[in-house]
């Protein structure tokens, strides 16, 4: 299924699905389609496309997307890391869990987990900033605009003593 069609389906379904809080986990179900696979396994680019769709579902269902449109803010990815544990084959069903994991003064960090039958397939960490007309939007302003009490950890998921690969695979 094409990226834009999936995004349209997610947008429409978000209207009818339960709204979530900024600290909740967004769960989506997918299937690997032939155009997403090289030979017989889902390719790396498709994993990233799915993470973007998961992030958009999160933004739609938290109400953050409406605020971004009203404020003319756009999300920009600063960095992203994916660790693959097992491959997904054509036509296999899998789930994507997306959550806002922590923040600092400038960045929001999303963790996204690919699961098949509750088994870890891959895990990603995506660092996102929002930019408005006058530059980068501070996280404090973002949280204020959501008019909700949020207690996100303000400490990094990964410290200097361990690698991101090890941390993402043990979650």
What are these regions (language model features)?
Residues 1-15, 84, 88-93, 99-171:
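HotDog/MaoC-like acyl-thioester-processing domains
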Residues 23-25, 77, 93, 107:
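A general secondary-structure signal for short beta-strands and their flanking turns/coil
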Residues 68-90:
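Small beta-barrel nucleic-acid-binding modules, principally OB-folds
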Residues 2-54, 162, 166-171:
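Catalytic strand-loop segment that frames the active site of acyl-thioester-processing enzymes
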Residues 30-32, 93-96:
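Short beta-strand segments
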Residues 26-30, 75, 80, 124:
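A broad, low-specificity signal marking well-ordered, structured residues that form hydrophobic/aromatic
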């Amino acid at each position: 299924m094409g990226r834009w069609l999936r995004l349209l389906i997610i947008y429409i379904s978000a209207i009818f699905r339960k709204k979530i809080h900024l600290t909740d986990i967004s769960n989506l179900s997918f299937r690997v389609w032939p155009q997403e696979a090289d030979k017989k396994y889902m390719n790396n680019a498709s994993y990233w496309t799915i993470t973007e769709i998961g992030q958009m579902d999160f933004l739609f269902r938290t109400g953050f997307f409406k605020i971004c449109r009203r404020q003319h803010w756009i999300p920009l990815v600063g960095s992203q890391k994916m660790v693959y544990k097992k491959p997904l084959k054509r036509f296999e069903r899998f789930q994507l869990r997306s959550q806002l994991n922590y923040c600092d003064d400038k960045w929001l960090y999303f963790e996204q987990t690919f699961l098949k039958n509750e088994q870890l397939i891959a895990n990603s960490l995506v660092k996102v900033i929002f930019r408005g007309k006058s530059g980068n939007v501070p996280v404090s302003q973002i949280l204020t605009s959501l008019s909700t009490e949020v207690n996100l950890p303000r400490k990094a998921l990964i410290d200097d003593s361990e690698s991101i690969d090890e941390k993402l695979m043990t979650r």
